[in-house]
UniProtKB/Swiss-Prot annotation:
Family matches, as NCBIfam families: PRK04208.1
Functional note: RuBisCO catalyzes two reactions: the carboxylation of D-ribulose 1,5-bisphosphate, the primary event in carbon dioxide fixation, as well as the oxidative fragmentation of the pentose substrate in the photorespiration process. Both reactions occur simultaneously and in competition at the same active site.
Organism: Calamus usitatus
Residue list for modification N6-carboxylysine: 201
Protein name as catalogued: Ribulose bisphosphate carboxylase large chain
Propiece residue ranges: 1-2
Modification type N-acetylproline: residues: 3
UniProt keyword Chloroplast, yes or no: yes
One MF annotation (Gene Ontology) recorded for this entry: ribulose-bisphosphate carboxylase activity
Misc. comment: The basic functional RuBisCO is composed of a large chain homodimer in a 'head-to-tail' conformation. In form I RuBisCO this homodimer is arranged in a barrel-like tetramer with the small subunits forming a tetrameric 'cap' on each end of the 'barrel'.
Length: 467
C-alpha cells in the first residue's frame, strides 16, 4: 500500500484513546422533552476529575467504548450519545458528585424496561474510573412512558372491583411462610379473611415446594376466600404467588388462578425479572386479574447509599413494567428524612404528576400522563398501635399489611384480624370527624378497645413494642 493511500484512508479517524470529557461532557447542552434524564451519585477514583467520571458514565451507558473506533464515522454520535450536562457536589460527602446525564430517546426499545436498564445500568457500574456509582433517579419522558401499558388496572379500577372505598385496605402475610401443608395454609387464610381483612398473602419465597405444591395451595386458598366472602358479604382476595422458574410455568399458574375466579395474583418482580413481569402484567389486564408485586432482592440493589440504585428508580420501573401493588416500607419508627424519602417514591407510584423536590429525593419533575397508579403496601413490624400513624401517613390509597400483627394475636388469626379492622375503622372515622390522628392516635385506639375485646387484647400484647 502506498503512503498516499494510507493518508487517504486515515482521513477523519485517529486511532488511540482520548478523554471521555472531550466528547461526552457537554455543560452547555439544553435537555429535550424527549430525553431520558438520569441522576447518578458518582464517587470517582483518586485522581479522576468529576467531569471525566461523569462523562465516562454517559459514554459507557450509551455509545462509548474504551478507545476510538473507525465505525464511529458510520453514524451520528451527536444524535445518539449520552451527555453529562451538569455536575454538582454532594454536600456533606467527600468526593461524591451528582452527575446528570441525558439520553436520546432513540437509544431505547419501546415498552421495554429490560432494555432501558440494560443500557443505563447494565455495564457502567464496573467501570474502573469509578470507586462507586448509584443511580438516584430517572426522568421518564411522556414520549417513552406512553409506550408502556403500565399497571394492569390501577387504583380506581381495583376499588371498583373490590367495592371498597374511603379507607386503606388491610392485608396479612401467612406465617410461617414455609412448612405448612396446603390445607393448613388455607385454614389460616380463611380465619384472617373472615375476621375482617381484605387480603391475605403468599410470602415472596412461597412458590411450589415439596411440602406445598402450587396447585394445592391455589385450590385451598380459593376455597378459603370464597367461604369467607359468603360469611362476610365482602369481596376477599389472596395474593397467589405465580412466580416460577420459567415464564411458561409462571403463566400456567396465572391462568389457573384466573380459572379459579380469584381476583389477584402475585409476582416477585426483581427475582422474576422485568420481561416476565411485563408479560404477566399484560395477561392480568387482558384477563381481569389484579397484580400484587413483591420487591424481594431490592436491598441487594438499593441498600448501599453510594452504590447501586435507589428504590425510587425501581418503583418507577415497576410502574412502567406493571403492577397494582408494591411493597414500599412502613415509614413508622424511621427518621424524618427517611420518611420524606419514602413518601417521595410513594407519590411517584400513585400520582399523575410529581414536582421536583430534592428534600424528598425527587430529582426530576415526572409526568405519568394517563398511566394508572400503583397502591403502596406498608408492611413489616406493624401492629394496632401503629394504625393511626399509618392511616395519616399513607392515606386511603394504600394496603396496610399486618403479618405478625394479625397472626400473633393471643386468641388466634380471626381475632387478630378483627382487632386490626376495628382499629382501622376507628381511625378512619376519627379522621373523617376532623380529629388529629398524629396527636390523638393512642387515645382513639384506647376508646375503640373499650368495646372491642379483640382490640383490647391486641393493645395489651403490643403496648411495649417500639420500632
Amino acid at each position: 500500500m502506498s503512503p498516499q493511500t494510507e493518508t487517504k484512508a486515515s482521513v477523519g479517524f485517529k486511532a488511540g484513546v482520548k478523554d471521555y470529557k472531550l466528547t461526552y461532557y457537554t455543560p452547555d447542552y439544553e435537555t429535550k422533552d424527549t430525553d431520558i434524564l438520569a441522576a447518578f451519585r458518582v464517587t470517582p477514583q483518586p485522581g479522576v476529575p468529576p467531569e471525566e467520571a461523569g462523562a465516562a458514565v454517559a459514554a459507557e451507558s450509551s455509545t462509548g467504548t474504551w478507545t476510538t473506533v473507525w465505525t464511529d464515522g458510520l453514524t451520528s454520535l451527536d444524535r445518539y450519545k449520552g451527555r453529562c450536562y451538569h455536575i454538582e457536589t454532594v454536600i456533606g460527602e467527600e468526593n461524591q458528585y451528582i452527575a446528570y446525564v441525558a439520553y436520546p430517546l432513540d437509544l431505547f426499545e419501546e415498552g421495554s424496561v429490560t432494555n432501558m436498564f440494560t443500557s443505563i445500568v447494565g455495564n457502567v457500574f464496573g467501570f474502573k474510573a469509578l470507586r462507586a456509582l448509584r443511580l438516584e433517579d430517572l426522568r421518564i419522558p411522556t414520549s417513552y412512558s406512553k409506550t408502556f401499558q403500565g399497571p394492569p388496572h390501577g387504583i380506581q379500577v381495583e376499588r371498583d372491583k373490590l367495592n371498597k372505598y374511603g379507607r386503606p385496605l388491610l392485608g396479612c402475610t401467612i406465617k410461617p411462610k414455609l412448612g405448612l401443608s396446603a390445607k393448613n395454609y388455607g385454614r389460616a387464610v380463611y380465619e384472617c379473611l373472615r375476621g375482617g381483612l381484605d387480603f391475605t398473602k403468599d410470602d415472596e419465597n412461597v412458590n411450589s415446594q415439596p411440602f406445598m405444591r402450587w396447585r394445592d395451595r391455589f385450590l385451598f386458598c380459593a376455597e378459603a376466600l370464597y367461604k369467607a366472602q359468603a360469611e362476610t358479604g365482602e369481596i376477599k382476595g389472596h395474593y397467589l404467588n405465580a412466580t416460577a422458574g420459567t415464564c411458561e410455568e409462571m403463566m400456567k399458574r396465572a391462568i389457573f388462578a384466573r380459572e379459579l375466579g380469584v381476583p389477584i395474583v402475585m409476582h416477585d418482580y426483581l427475582t422474576g425479572g422485568f420481561t416476565a413481569n411485563t408479560s404477566l402484567a399484560h395477561y392480568c389486564r387482558d384477563n381481569g386479574l389484579l397484580l400484587h408485586i413483591h420487591r424481594a432482592m431490592h436491598a441487594v440493589i438499593d441498600r448501599q447509599k453510594n452504590h447501586g440504585m435507589h428504590f425510587r428508580v425501581l418503583a418507577k420501573a415497576l410502574r412502567m413494567s406493571g403492577g397494582d401493588h408494591i411493597h414500599g416500607g412502613t415509614v413508622v419508627g424511621k427518621l424524618e428524612g427517611e420518611r420524606e424519602m419514602t413518601l417521595g417514591f410513594v407519590d411517584l407510584l400513585r400520582d399523575d404528576f410529581i414536582e421536583k423536590d430534592r428534600s424528598r429525593g425527587i430529582f426530576f419533575t415526572q409526568d405519568w400522563v394517563s398511566m394508572p397508579g400503583v397502591i403502596p403496601v406498608a408492611s413489616g413490624g406493624i401492629h394496632v398501635w401503629h394504625m393511626p400513624a399509618l392511616t395519616e401517613i399513607f392515606g386511603d390509597d394504600s394496603v396496610l399489611q399486618f403479618g405478625g400483627g394479625t397472626l400473633g394475636h393471643p386468641w388466634g388469626n380471626a381475632p387478630g384480624a378483627v382487632a386490626n379492622r376495628v382499629a382501622l375503622e376507628a381511625c378512619v372515622q376519627a379522621r373523617n370527624e376532623g380529629r388529629d390522628l398524629a396527636r390523638e392516635g393512642n387515645e382513639i385506639i384506647r376508646e375503640a378497645s373499650k368495646w372491642s375485646p379483640e382490640l383490647a387484647s391486641a393493645c395489651e400484647v403490643w403496648k411495649a413494642i417500639k420500632f
